[in-house]
Amino acid sequence: TSQLKKEFELEDALNNIGKDITLSCCVHKIRTMGKISFVVVRTGRYTLQTVYSEDNCKDSIKWLKEGFFVNITGTVTENEKGINGIEIILKEIKLISAVGYEYPLHVSNKKLGCTLDVNLNNRSVSLRNPYERAIFKLQEGVCNGFREFMLKENFTEIHSPKIVAQGAEGGANIFHLD
């Protein structure tokens, strides 16, 4: 039987400085500077910087592109210039899933800089951008804070049906036949 992996937490890396860790992640950005490359990766909630050099990693990264999902293994090192104060020195990188098409927008840019139509038509991709995702993190924090306060005051949380002007789910009665 296969075991479900727990989601990566930043503490997993911070508690393993000098040790090797393996994690599944998405390639966010690749910056090559001479013989080394900085591969910024995203996990469910975190962005981490990895450092690739041919001396340390047995795998080439010439095939690697933004959006690819990979398993990486590397040594966690402290570096105040690294994202979250750490870097992972890559030892191994294996492809899980490649992107089948060119993204219509670049999620590694600070701001997407695209029209609202392009953003909404590609929402599953645009939400990979930290700036686009921040509004939902803010909303999550406000809702959790409000919920915790109300529960401490002995209120009951109720999930009521929503009343809307039109049929929310649709149905045969919305379609007219001539």
Give the residues covered by each predicted segment:
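Class II aminoacyl-tRNA synthetase catalytic cores and aaRS-like
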Residues: 1-178
